[in-house]
């Protein structure tokens, strides 16, 4: 068990202080400079001959990135490079029309324009026009292609001859789009193609951070934006770590940087971007996207959704969820009340979400792992004489993932031992069969979701979140949460095992002592086996007539 202070939950930049001071004056690094994998592959592809005619590049499906790829290709190949954002047969292939006199007007297509060079297209265009692919494939394999006759009802004095082309194709798209290409043609995953990807982030190190600062300076210059000050770079690093959900990685997306820095320029003096201007831009973005999260908090405050942040309850715990809403640009956190009740039975733990077809496969897997750990911890020779049902209360949509398995375990052992759970503490984390607490996703959103509820219901000074220790490097919390941790209003505990988590939420050790949770469960089982089962309702009715 480890209660964290505010420094523990804040990304540390101490080792890069000297580099931060020089960041504004570091030489510019273009987008391509920070994509060595892509650049090396483009270089190889430009020198390839023979049957490999297609290069697949996994990247954001955006014309901006295709322009970057085109510029990278220009440095390796002195050849025609044609980009297309639309695809139809009339534009793709050579075509001709015949006038009333039988004269021909010839128009070259994109493939003809890219002859002896490269054609760059988005994967979506091929997916939207699968019927064109056989002809495209034939053309890039240097087979003869007939030009299209746009006036088939008119006779011409002559017909343009068929032609073979020497064209290489570069297809860009996101991973899911590239995967769908394989359904059109299996050759997309054969020696017919090469593959590379645009890297979306960069690992934090002295050299990489130098390159990253150079990239930011290049973006500011490329899009005529004010340059960042030392403090501005500091705020950008924190925002980048929040975006990647990792203190050891920074984003490389030009679109993300351009939007944030352009917005920050509206809050600046027009000359430089400092800490305050970037902070205001981030606050502005948060405000624009916070309607749904605020409505969720208001539903809790109005009592429409029951979430308790004070007192104690047996068999009830505050879990943490991340909500992904279609059409909403960001995920947000929301606490969920998880409850468990037990009754005499055969040891079965009923997953209500699964039975109601609201629980996904990963959630079901987490439930089974949690049950296996508890059975092992109790060291039972036979099944529990109790059955239990666990449910996400007031949950009306699908629940998936194993990140609630630690909370569900705490809830189950609370009901079995009749030991209350502190409602001031919310829990997130996955559990393995040995009781180790494993990392989960969406930590920042989950913590902030519970924080907002505690803030509006009133801080007690003892509220907080139990989270996996292995998730510490993913923390980049909102400044309000950091401030409350500084002031002792809100707390975060990191744990590595179930034995560390149970004492925080139940104020009792999990095992090893007389008053342990395992001891109480064992005692209850023993009492049950020692005494005769209570009469059922049927037996009592029979006794009335004896």
Stretches with model-predicted labels:
Residues 339:
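Short, surface-exposed charged micro-motifs
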Residues 1-27, 40-45, 108-111, 120-130, ...:
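Peripheral, non-AAA+ core regions of ATP-driven protein-machinery
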Residues 1-182, 187, 194-205, 213-230, ...:
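Conserved ASCE/P-loop NTPase catalytic core
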